[in-house]
Amino acid sequence: MTVDLLLGLQWGDEGKGKIVDVLTSNYDIIARFQGGPNAGHTLEFDGIKHVLRTIPSGIFHEKSINIIGNGVVIDPVVFQKEIEGLEKFNLDIKSKLIISRKAHLILPTHRLLDAASEASKGKAKIGSTLKGIGPTYMDKTGRNGLRVGDIELEDFKERYRALADKHEAMIAFYDVAIQYNLAELEKEFFEAIEELKKLDFIDSEEYMHQAQKAGKSILCEGAQGSLLDVDFGTYPFVTSSNTTAAGACTGLGIAPNKIKEVYGIFKAYVTRVGSGPFPTELFDEVGATMAKIGNEFGSVTGRQRRCGWLDLVALKYAIQVNGVTQLMMMKGDVLSGFETLKVCTEYNYKGQNISHFPYNIEPENVTPVYKEFKGWQADLTGMTTYDELPAELKEYIEFIEKEVEVPIKIVSVGPDRKQTILK
């Protein structure tokens, strides 16, 4: 029996989908434990780019079972479209995908509430993706939400109506101009619910328990990144779920002592989409070049990501919070061609150098302290072994390992699953 965990260590978009895809053949079960369709996992192979929003990244592998855990929130409409997109590739979704009855449903009115709430904030917007994630988790913690298991109940529509009516009253309270046709949205929602019923619903915590007893190997897949965690992220510019390792336990019903390896994924630089503090953000041509070469546009929102140098203060913090045992560095190829690279090793926080991640990293409080490295000019995308990598990149990697005290086991040198170097 093996239970391993894979998660992002920055503000999301680290490349988790590709690594899950690379590792999937080693596992019987791939289980998503938090988040919703606000984040996309991008996989690229055979010249085709695939973006998964709710479905685990193991869906492309014939032998793996994919679980959507209780910590996930599901928009039936988005979910149906995702399934339809996958079925074009002749994937047998029904036999490979199962859903926890305890996963919460995103209603059309959750999305409208999200839009109304964000609009009401004016300049204080937090950069919500407007997918209804926050309002759905609010209903979950407020004990008002609807869950997948409720679909099986005879009075599901009555439960839906009661909650939707509450939402409409809240939308009116915000007193902002939002155009929508709820009848049309609800028609689409209930059609998608009928499609959702065709899949298998399970008591996922019992399923996971029995799988462990049977000696199955399980990979728990996180969405977004650790710095977006509702507790440990850059609050309030965070998501509404626990994106850290603890979220795998609460989002799947797995005991903490069952988890063996914790794989931490990070980019060789840093990106962030939307609002929020970002100490190493670049506002010059270097940052623009990173975004262009790295194709840094959100897979779900299409928004351009903000780019900056690698931040070891934030990375060490994420490693500590998650108990990371192995690191995987993504997009090393994007840094090819830069004469000089920088890595943030400390923050100057209110006039004093510190090496820990403080409560407030707003720019008026924090200035990054950098160490410079000589860049490399070689194209990495065709390299297949660690020995082939340029000496400057090896120095960069080894410095990171020394600073964070965790080994880097994988270096990604391109988007395709084949462009993955094992160290």
Where are each of the predicted segments found?
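Non-transmembrane, aqueous-exposed alpha-helical and coiled segments at domain scale
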Residues: M1-K423
